[in-house]
Amino acid sequence: MENTFKLLFETIEERKRNPLPESYTNYLFSKGEDKILKKIGEECTEVIIASKNNDKEELVKEMVDVLYHCFVLLAEKNIPLEDIMEEVTERNGKLSRVGDRREIDTL
């Protein structure tokens, strides 16, 4: 799975370095950070709706869209995927105490 994410991220970085006409990724880069952030927000909303509708297939698709747009944002901000992977590795296995976290209000 890590390799799949790496390949996707490398493709996104390649589009940033060498734009292809008609590429959606290049469209996002050309519109800039605000457009990328807007798309992340839209896709996160679609994740919420799919989850509330108990639509597993749609939820998976929308999660992929969120990941893709987050990868575009990382590339836009020149943050390598390795930085994310290192942070995940560092957090993996850490014990987190519920009391250390702020309360989440229910809907």
Swiss-Prot record:
NCBIfam families to which the protein is assigned, alphabetical: histidine_hisI, PRK00400.1-3
Organism in which the protein naturally occurs: Bacillus anthracis
HAMAP family: HisE
Principal subcellular localisation of the protein: cytoplasm
Single Gene Ontology MF annotation: phosphoribosyl-ATP diphosphatase activity
UniProt subcellular location: Cytoplasm
Biological processes, Gene Ontology terms: L-histidine biosynthetic process
Domain of life: Bacteria
Reaction catalyzed: 1-(5-phospho-beta-D-ribosyl)-ATP + H2O = 1-(5-phospho-beta-D-ribosyl)-5'-AMP + diphosphate + H(+)
Entry-linked InterPro entries: HisE, PRib-ATP_PPHydrolase-like
Annotated family: Belongs to the PRA-PH family.
Keywords assigned: Amino-acid biosynthesis, ATP-binding, Cytoplasm, Histidine biosynthesis, Hydrolase, Nucleotide-binding
UniProt keyword Endoplasmic reticulum, yes or no: no
Enzyme Commission number(s) of this protein: 3.6.1.31
Record's keyword annotation contains rRNA-binding: no
Recorded metabolic or biological pathway in which this protein acts: Amino-acid biosynthesis; L-histidine biosynthesis; L-histidine from 5-phospho-alpha-D-ribose 1-diphosphate: step 2/9
Protein name, per record: Phosphoribosyl-ATP pyrophosphatase
